[in-house]
């Protein structure tokens, strides 16, 4: 084993402060590039000047529940202050509750936002909670109509980020002759992303679950001439904004701020025009959220989204699932048509960066993702069920996505999927 000398150890400690300073400075510069979409300093100055002007007219505040996250030691506090955005935080130094930034753990930052409003800090409109290593964070916002803090679901956070960064990319590059906007997501990301992208004239490409798969597919698509400004795994809300290759809650927050601050001929107005919705110039974040396509989606952290299985051979399990599914389809097709308007289905698999549609043999997905897309009489997708086995534990991750506010339909389809997997696992 190697042991260092006292002088070598001292040399490390002697440069720790300067090294930390340089690291934070590099991160701050990179955040500026990621948020603005360019390394051009003059453009960055103009962009943040526009933000400063908006904030001078309408002050903004952000609250963070660090929950002992490493982000407390990062640039967040100073970065917001540089932009004249009031910043508040709780649980700076300690892990005070569960660490996954999902709805059940965002109640703490929501409560702090409501406390701040009671004390007169009405400028606080956004809140976030990062995970321990600081790359993931989900959002709480202040609903002016309900006068309370509202927790956004992971798929809603990602949808807002996609809306913001797609429209921003179009705003930046639409006059370029070869501009081809695209979004890259993982297999279980809600179909609401397809609706947003379609309205904005963008393509959606899907990879297998796993941040590396999504990042690699985005690189492949850029090599093919697409502009992929935004990518990520909607199932966990994580936003990856190019040129970054990892999630960052700062990019998520500033995506939402872009929507709010760019008013005249801005991003939200572009979205309303292209999606055929009425534009109100005096809009709030609540209005933007209300304009999003409505879907009912299983939350990734819900107990019903994890199913224990005995079969370790995923290929065998999926072959048995197909047999059970096709047998049940013959029995249930009439009921599915009458209750939910489901006329047909299509199997889709994802393995690494490759998505294959119209699959006839479910088992070819092996350890990858398997999705059954349900279609209506016009052959349009209206729901899907999805599954993928864990590589580290004997469980299957499952979920359902349904177009519209249809809680009963989502529940019924997920229960059906659960029954079929259990039958296949015998």
Residue ranges and their predicted role:
Residues 1, 23, 27-42, 51-52, ...:
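Structural signal for hydrophobic packing residues in well-ordered secondary-structure cores
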Residues 1, 75-77, 135-156, 193:
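Short Gly/Thr/Asp-enriched flexible loops that form oxyanion-binding sites at enzyme active sites
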Residues 90-95, 154-158, 208-213:
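Short, acidic/turn-prone active-site loops that include or flank metal/cofactor-
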Residues 126, 130-132, 142, 147-150, ...:
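Phosphate-binding and adjacent anionic-ligand microenvironments
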Residues 105-129, 162, 191, 210-212, ...:
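Phosphate/diphosphate-binding loops
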Residues 1-23, 152-177, 265, 269:
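Ser/Thr/Gly-rich flexible loops in soluble cytosolic domains mediating phosphotransfer, phosphorylation
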Residues 2-4, 89, 129-136, 231-232:
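Core alpha/beta catalytic barrel or barrel-like domain that forms the active/cofactor pocket
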Residues 1-120:
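Gly/Ser/Thr-enriched, mixed-charge loops and adjacent short helices
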